[in-house]
C-alpha cells in the first residue's frame, strides 16, 4: 500500500512516464537533477560511458564501483563523478547511479526513478521493481560499445591529463611512500641487501648528498648498475637531486654506448666495483668503454659517509615530519622536467634517446598499477634490467604502491630467478617471452618454484604460441600478454588479469589515459574495425620528442583529429571489443617480387612444418629467424637462420618445400647457426642478425 501511494505521488509530480527501449533514441535531457539510475553494471566503463551523455551533470555512484576505480577518486572527481557507500550521503544533485544489488536503498525514495539496464536482465527488473521511469539501453551490445568507445577514450585521456597535474613529482611520491613503509620490507636482492622503508630513504638521502657534490653542474647523469638495491638507491638519489637519469645498456655494443653517452652529454657515470668486475669477466671493460667520462663507484661513496652522519640522518628520517624532510632533501622539479633518457635497444638502427618526462613516468606507473591491479601485499620479482623501460616501470609500480621488490641481476639465470621467487614468495613476474622460454626449457626449474606467482605479464616482443603453451603446461600459470614501446614509457596495452578476459593472440586493451587507432600506412586514413594497418597511439604516457633529433621526432609523430599521435611502426588491428592484435613490425616485412611477406608469419609456418616432422620446439630447444636482405633481381630475398643442430640446411629446405608453405614465403637460403643474436633485454638483435646473414650470403 505504501509503495502504491509513493508511486501515485511521483506520478503527480512528473505528469508522465517515460518508457524507452534499446531501439529508440534516448533523450538524455530527461535526466533531471535527482534522477536515479539503477544498473546491473556500475563498472568504471559504464560510468564513463554515462558521463559522455550526461557531460554537464554530476554523477554519484552508490556502491559496487569496481576495483579498477580504486585510488582514482580524485581523477573521477575532476570530471564530476564521485561514489558513496550509502544513500544518506547523496546530496540529491545530478544523477545517482545505483548498483542493482543496492536497489532497496532507493526504492522508497521520493526522487524520480529511471531504470537503466546494461544487459539481458531487463524483464526481470521491470517486473519486480516499483520504478517510475524505465530505460533499456544495452551498453554491453557491440554496436553501442563501438559508438561509445571513442568518446570514452577521449574522456579518459582528458581525465588523466587533469589527474597528472595534481600529482607531486616522482621523487617526492617515492620518497614519501618509503617513509610510509617505515620498518616494513621494501627491497631485497641476491647480494644480501635487505632494506626497509627507513633504511631505503636513509641510503638515498646520504647518496644524494654525495652525488650532488660530484654532479653539481650536470643535467644528465649516467648509471651503469644491475637490477639491485644499489641500482634503485642510485636512481632515487639522482631523482632527489633533480637529475635526468640515463640508465646505460651494458649489453649493447661499444659503438652504441659511446653514441648514447655523446648524445646525452654524459660526464659522470655511476657504477660499482663489484659490478665492473663481473662485466670484466664477460669481456666488457668499463674503464675503456667509458674512458671519456668520470666514473663514480658506489663503494667509494659509501666509504665517504661517516658513522655519525649515517646515524644522524637515520634519526632525522624516523623523527621529522615528511613535509620537512621533503623540503630539506629534495630539489624541486616540475612535471614537465626530464626524468629519464632511455636509449632504444638498437635492434634495428642506431639507438635513439627517448626523453621520458616526470609526467610520462608517473602516468605509466599509475596506468600500469590500474590495469594490473597491483596490491599492497604484492611482491615483484625484479629481474629485467633497469636500462629496460618495461623493467624500470614495473619495478616503480611496486615501490610507488607500498609493495616490495626482490631483485636478481641476470634474467637469463633460470635457476637464480627460480630461487629468488621461491625464497621471497613473489607474486608478480614481468619478463620477455625469451626469458619465459628459458625458464620453461630449464629442467632444474619446476612448477613449485613459481607456485606463489599470481600474475605473469610479458611484453617487449611477440609471445609465440609455442612459448605460451610450454610455459602454461609446465607451471600451470596464465601469461598475460601486453604491448608497448619505450616511446610510450612503455606500457600501452595489456590483457587484464581479472576484470576482462585474457584474449589469447591479442595484447589486450589500451591502458586508461591512452587511445589506439589503426590507419593506412601511406594515406593515413583511419581503417575500420578488424582491418590491419599501422598502429598509432596518443596518451599521457607518450614521449614528446627524441633527444637532439627533431627530424626523427617529426617522422614518428602525426597530427590527426586535433591531437598528436605516435606512429609505432607496428602493423595490427583492433577488434569490436577494443582488443589490439599486433601482426608484426612493418620493418619485419620483406618485399619479394613486389609482394609483402611477413617474416614473423613465415617463422610460425616453419615451426609448424618442423613439428609435423617430429621437431617440436616445445620439446627440443631451437629457434628460427627469417631475415630479409637486398637482392638486385627480386628486390629482397629471405634467408632462414636456425639453431636445430641435428638438421642440415638441405634437409630443412626439403621439409619446407613439401610443407605447403606458399612459394612466395619460401626462403632462398638456409643457414644453421650456433645461436640467434640477442640483446640484453632478451629481444632478438635484428641488426646483428641482418649483418650475420649478409656475411653468410656473401660467403
PLM features per residue range, with description:
Residues 362-379, 387-427, 442:
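Conserved AMP-binding/adenylation subdomain of ANL enzymes
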